[in-house]
Amino acid sequence: MKIKFCGIRRLEDVAFCNELQPEYLGMILSSGFRRTISPETAEQLVKAKSRSIAAVGVFVNETPEHIAQVLKQVPLDVIQLHGSETAEIVSGVRWRTGLPVWKAVQVQTAADIQAARQLGADRLILEGKAGGMGITADWELIA
């Protein structure tokens, strides 16, 4: 199991991550969300994190071109897609950025998992409800 702290917004959050050493530190880089940060802030946070922690940029329904543009300023290690992105978008993001692409999906049925596998992401993040809700997925479906 690997751990990602997500929604990181402040240098104090990064200091906490540096102390606890999760494998990943996630930052919301799409506008319109409570924990969204600017690319400028993300750049500062990435510079402050421990080298042993990978930086994950979380994007919601953005184009591969937009994500690649953000990457010019923010040195990310992983791209996480958290919207209704298609396999074509997943592939386009990977091609444009050269980074691993993770895809978050809501899991209500076994068919949801099968459909998610067709997206071609490097990793799937399986959720019970949309991100940050604290609702556990049905572990029986995932097993």
Segments (PLM) and residue ranges:
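Conserved N-terminal beta1-alpha1 strand-loop-helix module at the mouth
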Residues: 1-143
